[in-house]
């Protein structure tokens, strides 16, 4: 294994698999594209890049005969492992998701305050080299929106509503809440991505028996005996027994990445990869009122946060994907809580924009 600070190291070493983990969408896209064109497999940890152009990178990888995969151990990859298993068993996925610990008071949080909200001291922050913007994206909800967008684009499962429902839920609540409205649940339609919040409705305390760091699926079957088996073997179900919960209570980001590396290098398979065109996008939302000249500071910043929406709606409304909200100054007034229009920032000319345009995403945001 080689840890490199610069993408040029790819030209110098005979590397089979590149793990992209910079956390910056433009840098991540450029690094991954270069690796793919050099014939290297890519394990994409930078989900901020994946949700902006991952389908284009995956298409390029397929054309080059190499693997582009998200990683085992991070929630999107862990969800895909569970989903692949469930579908192989013949189960129908009603909803796929992960846990969160989202306090409404954190929605407009500032990265300068993120470590304090976690209760982290300076020694821990320094020793683990923690990034305040990254940890702020965990607190303001952006990271969960990004990760479920990655799952959406791997599976074709859309969000049921913009930003997802994200109800406060215990493990036993999940198969009850993620059911069609006609059957007492929240969903307009089945086959969606969503979140289960560990924070109670009071916005302060935690729900008992929550799944904050885990991932889950609500599943059903057309076969009555199979539905009965899911309950008989002890899975949490809704009162009717029609829907059951599959879950894994943890994920080990970084620890499990070697699994995906081995899959790519030895088996030429992925943990999960985007479909050829995206199902969803993460759009940039103003955390506060923005005036011309204010600079967008990306995921976990003080000025913007991200929410998931269906790609068809994003393209129609010409909203700005979060991946383009890094370092650009807005040229118009944007109200707090408003989705930022793509016209509010200068022309996009980087690798992200180029990849989207050449992949035919239908909305390149490069003009």
Predicted segment positions?
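A structured beta-alpha segment of the ubiquitous adenosine-cofactor-binding alpha/beta core
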Residues: 1-17, 22-26
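Glycine-enriched alpha-helix->loop->beta-strand junction motifs that scaffold or abut catalytic
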Residues: 14-15, 39-41
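Alpha-helical scaffold segments in soluble metabolic enzymes
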Residues: 17, 34, 56, 60, ...
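Rossmann-fold NAD(P)-binding glycine/threonine-rich loop
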Residues: 22, 26-38, 45-74, 84
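Short acidic, glycine/serine/threonine-rich loops at helix termini
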Residues: 54-57, 80-83, 98, 104-111, ...
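Rossmann-like NAD(P)H-binding beta-loop-alpha module
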Residues: 61, 65, 69-139
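C-terminal catalytic/substrate-binding lobe primarily of soluble NAD(P)-dependent oxidoreductases
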Residues: 116-367
């Amino acid at each position: 294994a080689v840890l490199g600070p610069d993408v040029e190291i790819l030209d110098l070493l005979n590397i089979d698999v590149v793990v992209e983990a910079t956390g910056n969408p433009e840098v991540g896209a450029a690094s991954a594209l270069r690796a793919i064109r050099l014939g290297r497999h890519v394990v994409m940890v930078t989900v901020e890049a994946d949700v902006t152009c991952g389908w284009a990178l995956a298409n390029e990888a397929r054309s080059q005969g190499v693997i582009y995969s998200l990683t085992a151990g991070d929630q999107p990859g862990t969800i895909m492992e569970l989903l692949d298993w469930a579908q192989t068993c013949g189960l129908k996925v009603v909803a796929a998701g992960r846990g969160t610990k989202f306090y409404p008071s954190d929605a407009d949080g500032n990265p300068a305050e993120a470590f304090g909200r976690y209760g982290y001291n300076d020694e821990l922050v320094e020793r683990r080299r923690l990034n305040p913007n990254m940890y702020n994206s965990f607190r303001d909800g952006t990271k969960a929106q990004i990760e479920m967008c990655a799952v959406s684009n791997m599976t074709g499962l859309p969000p049921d509503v913009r930003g997802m429902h994200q109800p406060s839920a215990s493990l036993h609540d999940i198969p009850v809440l993620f059911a069609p409205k006609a059957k007492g649940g929240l969903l307009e339609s089945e086959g969606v991505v969503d979140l289960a919040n560990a924070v109670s409705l009071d916005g302060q305390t935690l729900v008992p028996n929550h799944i904050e760091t885990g991932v889950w699926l609500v599943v059903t079957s057309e076969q009555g005996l199979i539905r009965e088996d899911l309950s008989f073997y002890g899975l949490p179900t809704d009162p009717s027994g029609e829907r059951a919960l599959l879950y894994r209570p943890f994920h080990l980001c970084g620890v499990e990445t070697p699994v995906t590396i081995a899959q790519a290098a030895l088996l030429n398979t992925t943990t999960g990869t985007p479909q050829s065109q995206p199902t969803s996008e993460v759009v940039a939302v103003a955390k506060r009122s923005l005036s011309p000249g204010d600079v967008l500071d990306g995921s976990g910043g003080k000025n913007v946060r991200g929410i998931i929406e269906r790609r068809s709606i994003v393209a129609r409304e010409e909203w700005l994907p979060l991946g383009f909200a890094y370092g650009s100054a807005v040229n118009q007034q944007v109200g707090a809580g408003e989705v930022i229009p793509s016209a509010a920032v200068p022309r996009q000319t980087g690798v992200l924009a180029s990849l989207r345009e050449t992949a035919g995403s239908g909305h390149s945001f490069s003009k």
